Regions:
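Hydrophobic, membrane-inserted alpha-helices
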Residues: 6-12, 62-71, 167-171, 184-193
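Alpha-helical transmembrane segments and their membrane-interface exit regions
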Residues: 31-40, 86-99, 209-219, 278-284
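C-terminal ends of transmembrane helices
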Residues: 38-49, 93-105, 169-179, 219, ...
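Membrane-interface helix-loop-helix junctions at boundaries between adjacent transmembrane segments
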Residues: 49-57, 61, 68-129
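Predominantly late transmembrane helices and immediately cytosolic-facing juxtamembrane segments
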Residues: 96-101, 197, 206-236, 243-244
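Long hydrophobic alpha-helical segments that form multi-pass transmembrane helix bundles
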Residues: 103-173
Length: 299
């Protein structure tokens, strides 16, 4: 629903304000990113026992250390760091969607027409990540974030578009064969978001209103408080029990971004620093959630 609303809002704003005006795009993107940031902070709740304070401290220290190293690496090697982030995000988002759908099948007791994960995982990841970065509006959007990223694809934008198209066709064919028509709608919705909305909004809305929501929904199955509320039929309480513990990460991320922006040695936009932190957090987040993903995918 949020994705559909974002598509409509973008189309309306593009007509009334203008597709080249980035002010409204940055505002929506920052809000969507803010919605998504807390979900990554919940990793330690499902990885380390909170009763073991020493293990928790070590975990948080290593988590922050890895994320901090990633931030510095991206700031130093903008293009290479961005390319690695694109690849990692593609894999992480694709696996995350596939894991969510498998968990949903398990909860509904669906044993037939299983998700053809091998044929859809890259499509679910590449459509929301790659397509927005190679459309006609990406140049001005990336220039607004960081001019070094404008030619991140090194001239292979058409080749990347062709690869994503092939992945999309293969995924749709596999879903038709397995009669998973609801998942085809998901792919079409993601494609519409990537094609019809500006790049900044496409990525941010996907991250905050699609990936983060699905990841949080999966966490309600493993967080004790959420699981208890779910078993009592209190779905909304179960969801919020998985969301609220991660909100300090939201404030921490923006405080860190503001600090880098104000006291940094280089002249970058606030939005660039926010994105850098979000991308950097993907590194430890992806490593930690691998165990949860393997279980969902039965690997």
């Amino acid at each position: 629903m949020a994705v559909a609303m974002a598509i409509v809002a973008s189309l309306v704003a593009s007509q009334l304000i203008g597709s080249k005006d980035l002010s409204w795009q940055v505002a929506i993107a920052l809000f969507a990113l803010a919605v998504g940031i807390p979900h990554g902070a919940l990793d330690h709740f499902v990885t380390v026992q909170r009763t073991n304070k020493k293990s928790m401290f070590v975990f948080i220290f290593v988590y922050v250390l890895v994320a901090g190293a990633a931030v510095l690496a991206i700031l130093k090697w903008n293009v290479l760091g961005f390319q690695i982030v694109v690849l990692m995000s593609l894999v992480h988002f694709g696996v995350g969607d596939s894991a969510f759908l498998n968990e949903l099948d398990r909860l509904k007791g669906i044993s037939s027409s299983r998700l053809p994960t091998a044929f859809v995982v890259l499509a679910f990841g590449s459509i929301p990540v790659v397509l927005p970065l190679i459309n006609s509006l990406s140049t001005s959007a990336l220039a607004q974030v960081n001019t070094n990223l404008v030619n991140w694809h090194q001239g292979f934008d058409e080749s990347l578009r062709a690869i994503v198209l092939v992945l999309f066709i293969v995924a749709v064919a596999a879903l038709i064969i397995t009669k998973r028509f609801r998942d085809i709608i998901d792919l079409l919705l993601l494609t519409a978001l990537a094609v019809l909305t500006p790049p900044l909004i496409a990525f941010a809305v996907y991250f905050g209103c699609w990936h983060a929501m699905r990841h949080t929904a999966r966490l309600t199955l493993v967080l004790p408080e959420s699981l208890s509320a779910y078993e009592q039929g209190k779905a909304l309480k179960a969801f919020w029990s998985a969301v609220l513990p991660g909100t300090p990460a939201l404030f921490g991320a923006f405080i860190l971004a503001a600090g880098l922006w104000i006291y940094g040695n280089v002249d970058k936009s606030f939005f660039w620093f926010v994105l850098t932190i979000v991308w950097a957090l993907t590194v430890p987040h992806m490593i930690i959630t691998a165990k949860l993903d393997r279980k969902a995918l039965r690997i």
